[in-house]
Curated annotation (Swiss-Prot):
Gene3D superfamilies: Homeodomain-like (1.10.10.60). Residues 154-224 form the SANT domain. The gene is swc4. This is SWR1-complex protein 4. One of its GO terms (biological process) is DNA repair. The keyword rRNA-binding does not apply. It is found in: Nucleus. GO terms for molecular function: transcription corepressor activity.
Length: 588
């Protein structure tokens, strides 16, 4: 049924109201991100993702073609062109492909046939080589010294270890391989000129020498430095030339060899050695970082050891009144310290001015100890509570340390404790101070010979014990040396006395010889009976000689005394000798 029929049935006007417009569908434009993200997947699958974008962009891999503008360009021609390499000296001509430039294109021949064009192309192929090879800039030649003449070699470069032929061979290899010493050492094989055996039958054939890389370098650097000095004297050289000359002249082959050996050892280390070296480096770094703290603490400790210098004025204590006032002040301070220790920490607080102590306060240590039980009985409940708490606590076990643990934690058991604060460095310093300055100097000299400082840098317990043992041994050595020197001096004195005694005895014997001979002549002239009675015995002759020697020792020769005019002193050895002989005579 149409709408007009309905209007007729309901008696409605035919066109009473305008027909409503049809509602148009509004299509929202999707953002570009959705379009880009939905590429490669279907619309339904992309709609399932919702508002959340995929974590990974889904793109289809496809070939990226050339831009459209490149397809419109014409293909550029290439041609085979000849070239020569400047590094070669034989003039070899090679060919390579090269893009043909617009200027190199031959102009088109108007009205020419195809055959003429082909001939022109063939003729253009035989082009001249390029003027400069593009890769010739990488052909860098090292700067080598110019070749020496015979006169220069004989005057400046002659060597006992290197011949002229071997030197020329080395310089040729250096020029050929461009100072690449690894290649030069590998290719080095100098063969000396063979000697004609028929012409020189007695000639000595030199042994083949194997040159190391360091020897080759040393020889080349010496030649290069000498030739540089001949061309430019050191006074006319530039700074760069002078530095190069100094480096070449100071080349040390032994040091270079040691450096390479050390580098080889470093490269051939095992993993354990590398790990150990790393640990040592870390320890060294830690010690270096803490060194400043150690120095500060050590300086602080040394400053405490030094006696502070008094800066106060002491003129007021130079009189008797000032000394008595100082004594009263010290006594008052001592009493206040004792009172503070007796009253406990409560009395340490300052009392208000004008407050007097109460009558029931204890005035002495005995009273305070007598009052202690009464104060303790005032609170029995607190005592019971403390007893119960102590009963609940488990008994504390005392751990006994082993000797290793005592050494580790520094636990010591002293037989006798000295009052006051002492440092180990002070105790070690007192060991080097003897009763006399001479002994102290001897101790210091002995420590200097042993290269031990008199003040220990790190006076630990073990170091102080070893230092004390060392000082004791040095003192024993010095005492033994002193006794030895004393005995040696006594031996020298006794030897001198013995020599003096022997000399005097010899002089006495020499003086008594002519008198003995005259007596023997007189006795021979007398009769046989008189000779037996008158001839002196050997003992009597010895006694007479001893008496004469004593007289000569006691009363020097008058003639010599008169000539010299000087009275000679008698030595102790002579007196002792004379007294011994006189006693012997009396006994006989």
């Amino acid at each position: 049924m149409a709408a007009a029929d309905v209007r007729d049935m309901l008696d409605l006007p035919a066109e009473g109201q305008p027909r409503p417009h049809k509602k148009q569908k509004v299509v929202e434009k999707r953002p570009d991100t959705d379009v880009q993200a939905s590429e490669g997947i279907t619309r339904e699958l992309y709609a399932l993702l919702g508002e959340r974008a995929p974590p990974i962009a889904i793109n289809e891999n496809r070939y990226k073609g050339r831009p459209k503008w490149m397809s419109k360009l014409r293909v550029r021609p290439w041609q085979m062109t000849p070239f020569t390499n400047n590094a070669r000296s034989d003039g070899l001509v090679l060919r390579h492909w090269q893009r043909q430039s617009e200027s190199a294109k031959a102009p088109a021949l108007e009205g020419a046939s195809e055959m003429e064009v082909d001939q022109a192309k063939a003729g253009g192929g035989a082009a001249t080589p390029e003027k400069e090879y593009p890769f010739a800039k990488y052909n860098v030649k090292p700067r080598v010294p110019r070749r020496y003449t015979d006169e220069e070699y004989n005057r400046h470069l002659k060597s006992d270890d290197w011949s002229r032929q071997e030197t020329d061979y080395l310089m040729d290899l250096v020029e050929e391989y461009d100072l690449r010493w690894v290649v030069i050492a590998d290719r080095y094989d100098f063969q000396p000129q063979p000697i004609d055996a028929e012409a020189n039958a007695t000639a000595l054939v030199p042994a083949k020498q194997y040159r190391t890389m360091e020897q080759m370098k040393a020889r080349y650097y010496f030649i290069a430095a000498s030739m540089l000095a001949l061309e430019h004297p050191p006074s006319e050289m530039s700074e760069a030339e002078f530095d190069l000359h100094e480096k070449m002249m100071k080349f040390d082959p032994d040091r270079e060899r040691a450096r390479k050996e050390l580098a080889a050892l470093q490269l051939n280390r095992t993993a354990d050695e590398v790990r150990e070296e790393g640990i040592l480096l870390e320890e060294l770094k830690r010690i270096t970082s803490n060194e400043q703290n150690f120095m500060t603490e050590r300086r602080e400790l040394y400053s405490r050891l030094e006696v502070p210098i008094s800066v106060g004025n002491t003129t007021m204590y130079q009189s008797s009144q000032g000394l008595s006032q100082l004594l009263q002040t010290l006594l008052q301070a001592d009493k206040s310290k004792k009172r503070r220790s007796i009253l406990g920490p409560e009395a340490a607080a300052p009392s208000p001015a004008g407050q007097t102590p109460t009558s029931n306060a204890p005035t002495s240590a005995r009273d305070s100890r007598a009052d202690t039980p009464s104060h303790a009985s005032a609170g029995p409940s607190s005592k019971k509570g403390s007893t119960a708490a102590a009963a609940k606590e488990p008994p504390q076990t005392v751990k006994t340390l082993t000797p290793a643990e005592e050494a580790r934690y520094g636990v010591q058991h002293h037989d006798r404790l000295v009052p006051g604060v002492q440092f180990r460095s002070d105790r070690a310093q007192k060991l080097t101070q003897a009763k006399s300055n001479v002994q102290s100097q001897k101790l210091a000299t002995a420590l200097a010979e042993l290269e031990i400082p008199p003040r220990l840098l790190m006076p630990t317990e073990r170091v102080c014990k070893e230092f004390e043992k060392l000082i004791h041994s040095v003192n024993l050595l010095l005492d033994a040396r002193k006794v030895s020197e004393k005995i040696e001096s006594e031996i020298r004195v006794l030897e001198a006395a013995r020599e003096e005694r022997e000399r005097k005895t010899k002089e006495v014997k020499d003086k008594g010889k002519p008198e003995v001979k005259s007596e023997e002549v007189e006795n021979s002239d007398s009769g046989a009976g008189d000779s037996a009675s008158a001839a002196p015995t050997a003992d009597e002759r010895a006694d007479e000689r001893a008496d004469k020697g004593l007289q000569g020792a006691e009363d020097p020769d008058q003639s010599t005394g008169d000539r010299d005019g000087v009275s000679h002193k008698r030595s102790a050895s002579v007196l002792s000798n004379g007294s011994d002989k006189s006693t012997k005579r009396q006994k006989k």
